[in-house]
Amino acid sequence: MIGPWRNLCQQHPYWVALLSGFLVPLAYAPVLILPLFYLGFGTAFYLAWQHSEHLGRLFRLGWLFGFGQLFLGLYWIGEAFLVEAEIFLWLLPFAVTLLPAGLAMFSALAFFVFGASLAWLGRAPSRSLSPPSSKPLSRLAALLWLAVLWSLAEYGRATILTGFPWNLPGMAWGSWLYLAQPVNVLGVHGLGLLALISVSLMVSKTRYGWHGGLALLAAAFVYSGVTLHTLGQVAGAQPSLQILVVQPHLDQREKWLPSKRQDHIEKTFRLTQAGGLAGFVDVVAE
């Protein structure tokens, strides 16, 4: 960790955890600043390692980090309350805070189980902010275990009570065509685990940690390139399929008005006709 940033982590861990959470959504579409994924998760994992002997503190750090990324990543939920704002606007603050607060319990649980499992093994780091590298459970092994626990927590968030799979770690790589292709074998949760393993390697402070993290990125890039090249050859051998996507972009305040129904239908047909002038369209998606 860079010196000033490390000092902030030591002096104000809770604020840093929250700020790190704010960084992560900026790695996803549409902003796509991938290094912020590594800075955000790298800082969170660093904090988890440094405070792994204090379960209550770990729980709070995990919750703040999760709340930060979900609060910023779910800002769009508030837009729904601006439709008929005179009725629903008062609910907006509750929606944009309570939902992230509840979902952040999954990340808090991941951090808590991380600390509890290290304590159970009798290998939690000392209270020193510089854990010795000679511990039975190395920093690298602990951080890799945290990557697994975080992935399990994200899977739980994506499935329990119908799930809410938003801003999963796999979406950081999945937003880049030449990193996303392992998803065809591993799924989005497996892709996220790979991304988090690369974070763990980079934060591990082992001799080849950074090299290992970059090598994992490079492997995903090569696999994606080979996959896309293969798919391109297969697609080139098949007849082309023309797909037209129509988005009428209706005003939400008018979308369900019975008096506007015919106008909406006619607009959709006009757009479909205009889009299909260049040739025959096989599929129309609205």
Predicted regions mapped to residue ranges:
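Membrane-embedded alpha-helical bundles of multi-pass enzymes
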Residues: 2-231, 265-269, 273, 283
